[in-house]
């Protein structure tokens, strides 16, 4: 089957020892109904679909060019399912918004500014290698799709990311390679008529490991000369990609369509306004203060409107008012630019290199962890720092690159900062971009996680705006971070540079401005923001209204910015020269480490142990996979307490006899209470010891004296071979616990009711032969029943009892007069009369109740109500004392009875088992 005709071109990027990268543009297969559609591939591994579409008709009442750039991150591109509730993509991420800005800024100046048809560029990320960033690929794809769309576009423009790695500028570096980057720079530009590359956009910053690489490994410092060299290094790569786009245009571009352009004003209207208002505007544009200047300009505009009310009657009122506003604004622009180019005179009277009045102050907001106010002229920034546990660092659901960050910089500019009203709430693209730039400027000087184990949120509130609030945010953030006690490696300052270009006496000249005002930003050709320490640059951003700026002009602007940066750093150092003491309201975080195999013990089943530690101490605990533990609390005392508990779990101390503890009751039973001595270590305080807390009086239940959660002072009475700990009340440690001794290998009864492992019968009554409170000496003359120790004395004198495999079960030939013991084989359990015959006993002893007529046994799950907590009250076992009224008689009778031999019972038979 015949398919669509696919056309493709390639651009090969040679990085020398770092290998080659191939950027391929393909069109004809996808999105065939868009005006322009290009699929861009990087090494056939990452794929971006770019489409450019224009509206069929111009937008009415628009006085600007309506260009929209959108980036659609598809999670399937990285083999992921979206983490949202509905499991589908939603609002764009911050990374997508920053990519939109990188694309929009170099594209917008290349369209006619009088075009009013809406143009939309959509970048869809279809596939991405986790080791590659997609933003620069999308920038090149956007230019390519616009080039073939038939729109009036003065392209191509192309972009490249360079990273300074081991002294070499590497194009399209991978994320793994960027770990060793001292500096990264994204440069976009276009080839001009003389074959040179004019730079249209810059976004740059030092690497997050730059400080270590520079000062510990001796790598190249990204100062002004090095960064200028990076701009030059980008030109060959930009030229190669632009040539590929030109080739694609030749083979696949549509014919350029005719679009209606809307001039902002007529030449006649501009000349008339210049005649009326030039002198007044010239004076008004010399007023230094922003608001008085704006008020005076508004008065002049109203005067012009009144004068022209009866003129230009061929235009309707709305059209006339719009053109009047555009022409009036253009007149202001020309006055400001002319004075700068010819007189080196600026609006507020400063020279080209002068900085406005500076002021800095810290600790102006109570209770917050750190705060500062930085003011430059009428630009005023409030910086606020918040510290917290590392578990509060931001998790990023990105297609590639870092998945978390511990330093988060949020920039906010409310409408009142310019004396206006407007929407407040969620951040706009501009606010996200400014916050990212300020964040980029400060990341290289932050302490490492090991040096300062905190998540840091920095908020910059632009509460007054008249030029370069983003660079003011960098200065305010430095002050605020130091005030919060963050040990920055060096203070950082930022400055915004401007540019005005034009022809003077037949020569095209450029004038660079330091610390631009808002009006100079609006009327100038460039907004060039530079941030850094006293020794190197940490962040750069360039936006321009020109088609491009020569690299040598930018290099000179970098040197001019360095002078201004040094002046601002002096003011910062005078205000605060180092990290202050941390606020009393800031959490104190201490660290410890546990062996990886002990992490489970610290956390406990379902987090029980770690939650208990946090509840008991009030500290917050976070454990990393390598066993590093971060503990946080206000004031630090709770954190120290939690650390000691965690250390005791990781390196447990086994309690020894004689040691005293203030333990917490964690469980009560019928035979005693379990007391927690150290995390994960409990001991048993027997009920006989608990009586000592009640002045030795008898207690019916442990809960009458101790309850779960109570604290009790105990002493370790002993530790058996299996690590079971017996506790006592101090002063009574020599008192023996009245616990039932071992009956074979019976282990701990606290679990199931198994009968094979019963060494520890805590809380039971012991075996019959060992019940100390029975006195059998005063009984009648009946021969005592032999106990187990009697059998040892005459064992050798008795005939060996035949085992089941060699004895004759017919015992009719026995040599004694005892009736033979009936075997289960010949018992007729249906004959109830034979059983009743046994009730006619020849003594006065009450017959032993059989299981058939023991009505009171019932459900024995709760055995705490019985006498001595194990087998029911004696009155329940002897019908003679069946009522509670006779209980005292029962006790007295027991004291008078003589010892009788223990009745032999098979070892595996317990008549009181359920």
Swiss-Prot record:
Residues 658-730 form the S1 motif domain. One of its GO terms (cellular component) is cytosol. Its main location: cytoplasm. Residues 407-427, 727-914 are annotated as: Disordered. It is an enzyme of class 2 (transferase). Its EC number is 2.7.7.8. Disulfide bonds: none annotated. SMART domains: KH, S1. Residues 587-646 form the KH domain. It is found in: Cytoplasm. Pfam families: KH_1, PNPase, RNase_PH, S1. Residues 742-789, 797-865, 873-899 have a biased composition (Basic and acidic residues). It catalyses: RNA(n+1) + phosphate = RNA(n) + a ribonucleoside 5'-diphosphate. It comes from the Bacteria. Its cofactor is Mg(2+). The keyword Transferase applies. GO terms for molecular function: 3'-5'-RNA exonuclease activity; magnesium ion binding; polyribonucleotide nucleotidyltransferase activity; RNA binding. Belongs to the polyribonucleotide nucleotidyltransferase family. Involved in mRNA degradation. Catalyzes the phosphorolysis of single-stranded polyribonucleotides processively in the 3'- to 5'-direction. This is Polyribonucleotide nucleotidyltransferase. It comes from Bifidobacterium longum subsp. infantis (strain ATCC 15697 / DSM 20088 / JCM 1222 / NCTC 11817 / S12). The gene is pnp.
């Amino acid at each position: 089957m015949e398919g669509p005709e696919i056309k493709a071109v390639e651009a090969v990027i040679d990085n020398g020892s770092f290998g080659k990268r191939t950027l391929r543009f393909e069109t004809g297969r996808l999105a065939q109904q868009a005006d322009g559609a290009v699929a861009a591939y990087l090494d056939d591994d990452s794929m971006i679909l770019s489409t450019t579409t224009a509206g069929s008709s111009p937008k009415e009442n628009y006085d600007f060019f309506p260009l929209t750039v959108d980036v659609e991150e598809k999670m399937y591109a990285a083999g992921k399912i979206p983490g949202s509730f509905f499991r589908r993509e939603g609002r764009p991420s911050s990374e997508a918004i920053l990519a939109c800005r990188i694309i929009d800024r170099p594209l917008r100046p290349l369209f006619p500014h009088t075009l009013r048809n809406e143009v939309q560029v959509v970048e869809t990320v279809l596939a991405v290698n986790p080791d590659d960033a997609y933003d620069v690929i999308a920038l090149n794809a956007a230019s390519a799709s616009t080039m073939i769309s038939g729109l009036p576009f003065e392209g191509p423009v192309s972009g490249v990311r360079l990273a300074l790695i081991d002294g070499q500028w590497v194009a399209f570096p991978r994320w793994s390679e960027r770990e060793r980057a001292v500096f990264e720079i994204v440069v976009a530009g276009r080839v001009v008529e003389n074959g040179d590359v004019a730079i249209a956009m810059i976004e740059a910053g030092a690497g997050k490991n730059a400080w270590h690489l520079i000062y510990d490994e001796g790598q190249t410092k990204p100062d002004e000369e090095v960064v200028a060299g990076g701009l030059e290094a980008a030109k060959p790569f930009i030229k190669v990609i632009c040539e590929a786009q030109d080739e694609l245009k030749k083979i696949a571009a549509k014919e350029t369509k005719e679009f209606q352009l809307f001039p902002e004003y007529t030449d006649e209207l501009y000349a008339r306004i210049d005649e009326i208002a030039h002198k007044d505007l010239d004076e008004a544009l010399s007023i230094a203060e922003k608001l008085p200047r704006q008020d005076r300009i508004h008065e002049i505009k109203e005067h012009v409107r009144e004068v022209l009310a009866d003129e230009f009657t061929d235009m309707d009122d709305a059209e006339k008012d719009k053109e009047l506003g555009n022409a009036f604004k253009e007149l202001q622009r020309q006055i400001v630019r002319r004075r700068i180019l010819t007189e080196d005179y600026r609006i507020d009277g400063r020279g080209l290199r002068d900085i406005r009045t500076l002021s800095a102050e810290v600790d102006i907001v109570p209770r917050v962890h750190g705060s500062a106010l930085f003011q430059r002229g009428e630009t005023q920034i409030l910086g606020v720092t918040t510290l917290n546990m590392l578990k509060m660092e931001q998790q990023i659901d990105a297609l590639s690159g870092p998945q978390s960050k511990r330093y988060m910089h949020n920039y906010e500019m409310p409408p009142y900062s310019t004396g206006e009203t407007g929407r407040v709430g969620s951040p706009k693209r501009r606010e996200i971009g400014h916050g990212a730039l300020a964040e980029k400027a400060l990341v290289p000087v932050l302490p490492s996680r090991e040096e300062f184990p905190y998540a840091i949120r920095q908020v910059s509130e632009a509460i007054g705006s008249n030029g370069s609030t983003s660079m003011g945010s960098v200065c305010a953030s430095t002050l605020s971070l130091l005030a919060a006690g963050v040990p920055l490696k060096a203070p950082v300052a930022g400055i915004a540079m401007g540019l005005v270009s034009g022809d003077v006496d037949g020569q095209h000249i450029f004038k660079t401005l330091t610390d631009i005002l808002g009006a100079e930003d609006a009327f100038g050709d460039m907004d060039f923001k530079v941030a850094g320490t006293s020794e190197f640059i940490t962040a750069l951003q360039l936006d321009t209204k020109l088609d491009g700026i020569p690299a040598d002009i930018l290099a000179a602007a970098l040197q001019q910015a360095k002078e201004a940066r040094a002046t601002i750093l002096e003011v910062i150092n005078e205000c605060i020269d180092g990290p202050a003491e941390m606020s009393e309201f800031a959490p104190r975080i201490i660290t410890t480490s546990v062996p990886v195999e002990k992490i489970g013990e610290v956390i406990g089943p379902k987090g029980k142990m770690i939650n208990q530690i946090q509840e008991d101490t009030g500290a917050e605990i976070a454990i990393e996979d390598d066993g590093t533990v971060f503990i946080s609390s206000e004031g630090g005392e709770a954190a120290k307490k939690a650390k000691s508990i965690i250390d005791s779990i990781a390196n447990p101390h086994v309690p020894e006899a004689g040691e005293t503890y203030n333990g917490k009751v964690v469980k009560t039973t019928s035979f005693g209470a379990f007391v927690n001595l150290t995390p994960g270590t409990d001991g048993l305080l027997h009920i006989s010891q608990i009586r000592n807390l009640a002045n030795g009086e008898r207690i019916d239940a442990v809960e009458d004296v101790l309850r779960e959660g109570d604290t009790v002072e105990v002493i370790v009475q002993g530790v058996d071979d299996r690590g079971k700990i017996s506790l006592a009340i101090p002063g009574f440690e020599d008192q023996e616990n009245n616990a039932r001794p071992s009956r074979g290998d019976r282990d701990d009864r606290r679990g199931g009711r198994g009968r094979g492992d019963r060494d520890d019968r805590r809380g039971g009554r012991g075996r019959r032969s060992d019940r100390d409170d029975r006195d059998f000496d005063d009984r009648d003359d009946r021969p005592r029943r032999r106990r187990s120790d009697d059998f040892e004395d005459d064992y050798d004198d008795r005939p060996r009892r035949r085992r089941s495999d060699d004895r004759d079960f017919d015992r009719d030939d026995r040599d004694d007069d005892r009736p033979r013991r009936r075997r289960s084989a010949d018992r007729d359990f249906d004959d109830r009369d034979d059983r009743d015959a046994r009730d006619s006993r020849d003594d006065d002893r009450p017959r032993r109740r059989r299981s058939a007529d023991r009505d009171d046994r019932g459900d024995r799950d709760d055995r705490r109500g019985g006498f001595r907590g194990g087998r029911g009250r004696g009155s329940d076992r002897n019908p003679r004392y069946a009522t509670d009224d006779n209980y005292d008689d029962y006790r007295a009778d027991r004291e008078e009875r003589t010892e009788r031999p223990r009745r032999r019972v098979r070892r595996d038979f317990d008549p009181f088992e359920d």
